[in-house]
Amino acid sequence: MRRIEAIGESPVFLRHIHAIEVAEVSREFCRHGLSHALDVARIAWILVLERERPLSKDVVYAAALLHDLGRSEQYATGEDHDVAGARIAAEVIDGLPERLRFEADERAMIIAAVAGHRGACDADVVAEGRQEMLIDLIKESDNRSRACYACSARAACYWSDERKNLNLSI
């Protein structure tokens, strides 16, 4: 998984992760730093294996690691983090050494997952294509990564109870 290591070492990735972690240092609610990105990646990969989905580990991990990078821009400028995140994800992916670059279809899937990870998702429905499958997988894993059931800020959270992860499950 040298490509994933290269993403984690990318100056662009590190700059945005650092900016998120600084911006959220006093945040009462869920955070979006490296620990969250890794949680999403690991949960997503477990779901791929359990459901026997035709997605590569590199693509799943890349989408998960990059999915919230746009938060840095959202905090700085107010830009929607999905929009900013897609742009930042492209910058990270395109900055990889030539031998580690993703194929065009993989690149498109990763960027679509970053841009669409907050959209509609029904975990019980098998997405038609690999791109839709990845988008739904990242959204589901993002939600499952949240320990709302044990959160001290749960009552003050703007998420509806339907959206909150109220059970320890995986």
Give residue ranges: language-model regions.
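Metal-dependent phosphohydrolase cores
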Residues: 1-170
